[in-house]
Amino acid sequence: MNHPDYKLNLRSPGTPRGVSSVVGPSAVGASPGDKKSKNKSMRGKKKSIFETYMSKEDVSEGLKRGTLIQGVLRINPKKFHEAFIPSPDGDRDIFIDGVVARNRALNGDLVVVKLLPEDQWKAVKPESNDKEIEATYEADIPEEGCGHHPLQQSRKGWSGPDVIIEAQFDDSDSEDRHGNTSGLVDGVKKLSISTPDRGKEDSSTPVMKDENTPIPQDTRGLSEKSLQKSAKVVYILEKKHSRAATGILKLLADKNSDLFKKYALFSPSDHRVPRIYVPLKDCPQDFMTRPKDFANTLFICRIIDWKEDCNFALGQLAKSLGQAGEIEPETEGILTEYGVDFSDFSSEVLECLPQSLPWTIPPDEVGKRRDLRKDCIFTIDPSTARDLDDALACRRLTDGTFEVGVHIADVSYFVPEGSSLDKVAAERATSVYLVQKVVPMLPRLLCEELCSLNPMTDKLTFSVIWKLTPEGKILEEWFGRTIIRSCTKLSYDHAQSMIENPTEKIPEEELPPISPEHSVEEVHQAVLNLHSIAKQLRRQRFVDGALRLDQLKLAFTLDHETGLPQGCHIYEYRDSNKLVEEFMLLANMAVAHKIFRTFPEQALLRRHPPPQTKMLSDLVEFCDQMGLPMDVSSAGALNKSLTKTFGDDKYSLARKEVLTNMYSRPMQMALYFCSGMLQDQEQFRHYALNVPLYTHFTSPIRRFADVIVHRLLAAALGYSEQPDVEPDTLQKQADHCNDRRMASKRVQELSIGLFFAVLVKESGPLESEAMVMGVLNQAFDVLVLRFGVQKRIYCNALALRSYSFQKVGKKPELTLVWEPDDLEEEPTQQVITIFSLVDVVLQAEATALKYSAILKRPGLEKASDEEPED
């Protein structure tokens, strides 16, 4: 019995129904520290499980004196009792052990912590020269089931990764550009990879994925480098987590308890969110009598309270979504969890748009702008793009130089500052790109019509125009408001064809319509000139010390009728993509310098901090052990190490993908900031681009930060008054843009993970070559090269006679002995080391959206090269 349309009639959030005395069952998976709290006698007066938060005044004083530390909380998605905040000294992250120490804070919250006494710090084994790379991504869903078959033995003494880090930085302007929703998110799912295990487990003991039994640690006599600072949360500065979760409803286990008569238990899909008591009166009417009818129904629940004396939070059902594992219910759940506003724009917002359509540019506005409508200007975008932010132009001058223009949609013209439209765009802060659709920052009339630089239509733009040498050296630079009329809408495929066939005339029927004022040859030559200059710009950027870490990205083909994935492929980043990227980067850097020179205290810029030093040094040590010396003294040095180490053969390219993935992990996120809030200009720098100043100017249709930058540039050029905004106010908007951008990236990752899981179910099993990324003593991690996903393979999931783990020098090695197919045959032996190439099979599990990676037996026929996709 399905209930996809069941709506819940609820009171408004924030009105709990008198449950201050409720103490629920013990939380699952608690740390030893948690258990001490819960094992206290509950007879008589109830004792608090969580500490009372400190007062604002005491917190403020403690932060000033340095006795307290603030940071963003990150919870390990696979071991939810482990949490971390960054250490202010850039060293190993500060460890927060257990739900009790976390004190009701949720993932992403800005928290204040107090360090525990040193004898309570986490011991990190000093003899472990074979560094376990801190490699668990900040995935926003629990690890998928990995298909292992648990035996009756328990896991012993295994200590998990010390650090969970944020997703990889990516500041190229090709990043999720223009609604290219299929293939612009790194990886399908961020899973754990590890190198040699630190534990001393018996190799016959299976790895139990969700268990962790820490052993008491005597930290006396250990050096400071052997200890990881540990802390407890004493205050939540900002509840950045939405307090919403998707999951399923269950009856409480104890039918005789008073709680059973009042509450159901909401079990979130994300194990980092606590279980939640939901009043039965908020549940579907027949839930108590027929709970199994709802066993596979997804609900959204919002936490409204979490008291000091209760293991579980109190919540309120918000909506019934539909069946778990189906794309639309799961998508709505993802959007809700991450606070994405996907509601229709209000009538008040829509009234801010031009009401008389078709809209034309007012004559007085034409007179205020440089008229470029006769120039050969065109867009290059994914074929499916509708929100065309940018256009390009290039013409050779008589002296052999080039005039190159980057023309960006003038969104700020249509979004008056302080209007209802401005406020909702500022709140949304970014468009969110899912595999199957876009949740726009602005109403579609703006995104797809008025602002979008559609061909053969007059459009308002903000332009940067340079006079460049053939080598890309800037001789002159001009900024200003313009009017353009794009002559054609090229796709990346069209531009790539022009680049690959420089002397051939491309038939008109293979190209989109071109305005009669311009010819195919004119557009073709402009693309070739842009490509030639872009190659020089790119070469010089890397000579000057830039770094690029491209990870495998997955793109999908969808069935037009059902919306289900028909196939997928690795997104190919080609010369046409690089062409656009180089000129977007050039424009962003130029605008950054212009607005900072004019408004040194009020410029909205984008900085990229250097990588986390502890993780990076551990990774370098690991590479040394593997015979791969790496220079990480600068971004450019790292880029050279990655590029010079590898050849063009299949094995070398796969190894480069693995190392690129590993070196992405210590990288921090790039951040928007207000220039007036940082005194040291060295902190303005962008590590990966290796430039002193950078901003975002080129995508105002989908990023609100770009709208702010457009307004600053307009003021810098005298088009409008100087900005009347305090630096701290601008910083708050920058922080909000950072938060929403991070949430958007998470949603993109989860959307891709959702579609890939559905594809495995519908089209699987899927076979691929994979490269081993990490070896533990009973499992190993692989990068599945055909699909760009990372999976852990457990030895006890395989048809093995035995397996053993050893170190050869410092390198970890698993020896697998396969059961023979024929009793008369000898067992097959297979050695697994880091960078081994293996064949794997991805197959769906019974649980919705879960799939396993299974190692193929050596000697079996390899997977066909025939694609199951497209």
UniProtKB/Swiss-Prot annotation:
Q: Could you list this entry's UniProt keywords, alphabetically sorted.
A: Acetylation, Cell cycle, Cell division, Cytoplasm, Exonuclease, Hydrolase, Magnesium, Metal-binding, Mitosis, Nuclease, Phosphoprotein, RNA-binding, Tumor suppressor
> Where does the record place the region Disordered?
1-45, 169-223
Residues that bear N6-acetyllysine:
250
Q: What is the lineage of its organism?
A: Eukaryota, Metazoa, Chordata, Craniata, Vertebrata
Tell me the Pfam families matching this sequence: Dis3l2_C_term, OB_Dis3, RNB, Rrp44_CSD1
According to its UniProt entry, the protein's GO biological process terms are:
cell division; miRNA catabolic process; mitotic cell cycle; mitotic sister chromatid separation; negative regulation of cell population proliferation; nuclear-transcribed mRNA catabolic process; polyuridylation-dependent mRNA catabolic process; stem cell population maintenance
The record's annotation in SMART domains points to: RNB (SM00955)
**Modified sites of kind Phosphoserine:** 31, 172, 864
Query: So what family is this one in?
Result: Belongs to the RNR ribonuclease family. DIS3L2 subfamily.
The UniProt record gives the binding positions of Mg(2+) as 381, 390
Basic and acidic residues composition bias: which ranges?
197-212
- What is the uppermost EC class here? hydrolase
Q: What is its EC number?
A: 3.1.13.-
Quote the protein name from its UniProt record: DIS3-like exonuclease 2
List compositional bias (Low complexity) regions by residue number.
Answer: 12-32
> rRNA-binding among the record's keywords?
no
- Quaternary assembly: Interacts with XRN1.
Q: Does the keyword Chloroplast apply?
A: no
- Site annotation (Important for catalytic activity): which residues? 389
Q: Which InterPro entries does the record associate with it?
A: Dis3_CSD2, DIS3L2, Dis3l2-like_C, NA-bd_OB-fold, RNase_II/R, RNase_II/R_CS, RNR_Ribonuclease, Rrp44_CSD1
Q: What is its main location?
A: cytoplasm
Write out the domain note.
Specifically recognizes and binds polyuridylated RNAs via 3 RNA-binding regions (named U-zone 1, U-zone 2 and U-zone 3) that form an open funnel on one face of the catalytic domain, allowing RNA to navigate a path to the active site.
